[in-house]
C-alpha cells in the first residue's frame, strides 16, 4: 500500500484524475475473483501490506486532493470453509435453499432478511469509511439484490431491497458526505432517489445502457453508422431518470471482450482517432466518468490480474500521443464547470444537431452559469468540411481541443482557432472539436 502511494498519486495527478476507485480490498482467497468473493469483510487483504499502510495511502491521497472509493460486495461471499459459509454449522449468513442461496458465480448469497446479516454488512461498509477514511463505496451487483438471482422474471426481492434502503440511509446518517454508487443494470426506478423518499438512496448509478450502446457503435464499420446513428442519441432519452455515472470498467476489458482501444473498428492506426473521438464524446455526455486503468495508454492486451499494465507501450509514439491526449482531455474536463456542474439538470445539456445521419456528425452543448462548451463530432471515415455549427447564441468561440491535432497523433497543427461570426468547421475523419465561449 505504501509503495503504491509513491507511484500512483503522482500518476493520478499528472493524468488529471481527481478520484480513484479500488477494486475490493477485503480479504479474499482467490486472486482470480478480483476480490469479489470475500472471506474477511473487516480485513484489508494482506497481499498489499498492513491495515496501517492502507490508512496511510488513503490519507496521502486526500492530502493530494484525490477522492478514494472502495468496491464493496454486499450480495454474496466465498464458499471457503474458513469464511462465513455455515459459520455456526448451519446456514447463518446464507439462505437454506440452494435455489436462491447459490449465486451464478458459485458463491453464497447473503440472506438479507435476517437482522444479523443486515447489521453485519452495514457495519462492514461503515468500517471502511470510519477506519480507513474512504470517501464512499461502490456496491457490486445490485441487480442481484433487487431481483431474485438478478432475474426480473422471478420478481423483486423485497427484503433485500429494504436492506439496501436501510443500509444507505444509515451510512448517510453517519457519513453525510459519503458517495454511494450502484453497479446496476436494471430498470428498477429510484435507485438514486433518497431512501426517505422511497428510493434506494444511492448517489450514482452506473449507466450500462450508455456503455453498451457506445461500445457497440464504435465497433461498427463506419458505413453502418448512418443506420445506427441514434445509438448515440438514445441515452439522452433517459439520462435524467437517475444520477448516472458513465463506466468503461474492468468488466469491459476481460473475458474475450477486447480492450477499449481494440473494440474500435478497423486496423491498428485507425483505432486511435476513433478512441480519441469517443472519449471526447464521453466527456461531453452528462454523467460522471469512470475509466479503468490502462485505457488511458491504449492498452491492447486484456486485463490480467496476474500482470501489470504494458507500460512499455508508452515507448511507441502513437501510444505516448494517445496518453498525452487523455491527460489533456481529463484536465480540460476538470477545468471547465460546464462539463460537470449540471450533470443531473436538464438545463445543462442540449443537442445542437442530432440529425446528420448522412454525414454522421453530432453537435452538443454543455452549460454552466457563465460558461458554454460545445462538442462537434465526426464519426465517419470521411472528412466533413464546411460544417456550420448551429449555435444557440452568437458570440466568440475558441477552439479548446481538436482530437486530430498532431500532438495527439493526428494530422492537424495545433492552432486553437477563434470564431467570431459563427463557427464553420472542417472536420477530420473520426474527430472531435471542442469549443468554449468567450
Task: Outline where the language-model segments fall.
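Substrate-binding/active-site clefts of carbohydrate-active enzymes
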Residues: 2-156, 420
Amino acid at each position: 500500500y505504501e509503495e503504491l502511494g509513491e507511484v500512483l498519486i503522482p500518476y493520478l495527478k499528472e493524468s488529471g484524475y481527481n478520484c480513484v476507485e479500488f477494486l475490493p480490498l477485503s480479504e479474499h482467497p482467490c486472486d482470480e475473483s478480483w476480490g469479489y468473493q470475500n472471506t474477511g469483510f473487516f480485513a484489508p487483504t494482506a497481499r498489499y501490506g498492513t491495515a496501517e499502510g492502507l490508512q496511510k495511502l488513503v490519507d496521502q491521497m486526500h492530502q493530494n486532493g484525490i477522492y478514494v472509493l472502495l468496491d464493496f460486495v454486499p450480495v454474496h461471499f466465498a464458499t471457503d470453509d474458513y469464511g462465513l459459509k455455515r459459520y455456526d454449522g448451519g446456514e447463518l449468513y446464507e439462505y437454506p435453499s440452494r435455489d436462491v442461496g447459490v449465486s451464478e458465480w458459485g458463491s453464497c448469497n447473503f440472506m438479507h432478511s435476517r437482522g444479523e446479516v443486515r447489521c453485519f454488512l452495514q457495519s462492514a461498509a461503515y468500517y471502511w469509511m470510519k477506519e480507513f477514511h474512504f470517501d464512499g463505496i461502490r456496491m457490486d451487483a445490485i441487480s442481484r439484490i433487487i431481483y431474485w438471482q438478478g432475474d426480473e422474471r422471478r420478481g423483486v426481492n423485497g427484503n433485500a431491497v429494504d436492506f439496501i434502503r436501510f443500509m444507505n440511509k444509515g451510512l448517510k446518517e453517519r457519513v453525510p458526505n459519503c458517495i454511494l454508487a450502484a453497479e446496476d443494470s436494471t430498470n428498477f426506478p429510484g435507485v438514486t432517489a433518497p431512501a426517505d423518499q422511497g428510493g434506494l438512496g444511492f448517489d450514482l448509478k452506473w449507466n450500462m445502457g450508455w456503455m453498451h450502446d457506445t461500445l457497440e457503435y464504435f465497433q461498427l464499420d463506419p458505413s453502418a453508422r448512418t443506420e445506427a446513428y441514434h445509438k448515440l442519441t438514445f441515452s439522452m432519452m433517459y439520462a435524467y431518470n437517475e444520477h448516472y455515472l458513465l463506466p468503461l470498467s474492468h468488466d469491459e476489458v476481460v473475458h474475450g471482450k477486447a480492450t477499449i482501444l481494440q473494440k474500435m473498428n478497423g486496423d491498428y492506426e485507425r483505432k486511435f482517432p476513433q478512441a480519441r473521438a469517443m472519449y471526447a464524446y464521453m466527456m461531453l455526455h452528462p454523467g460522471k466518468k469512470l475509466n479503468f486503468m490502462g485505457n488511458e495508454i491504449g492498452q491492447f492486451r486484456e486485463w490480467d490480474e496476474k500482470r501489470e499494465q504494458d507500460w512499455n507501450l508508452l515507448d511507441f509514439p502513437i501510444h505516448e500521443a494517445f496518453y498525452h491526449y487523455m491527460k489533456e482531455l481529463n484536465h480540460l474536463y476538470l477545468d471547465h464547470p460546464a462539463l460537470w456542474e449540471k450533470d443531473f439538470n436538464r438545463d445543462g445539456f442540449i443537442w445542437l444537431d442530432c440529425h446528420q445521419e448522412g454525414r454522421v456528425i453530432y453537435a452538443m452543448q454543455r452549460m454552466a452559469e457563465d460558461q458554454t462548451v460545445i462538442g462537434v463530432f465526426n464519426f465517419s471515415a470521411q472528412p466533413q468540411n464546411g460544417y456550420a455549427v448551429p449555435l444557440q447564441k452568437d458570440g466568440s468561440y475558441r477552439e479548446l481541443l481538436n482530437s486530430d491535432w498532431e500532438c495527439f497523433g493526428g494530422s492537424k497543427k495545433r492552432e486553437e482557432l477563434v470564431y467570431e461570426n459563427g463557427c464553420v468547421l472542417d472536420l477530420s475523419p473520426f474527430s472531435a472539436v471542442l469549443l468554449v465561449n468567450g
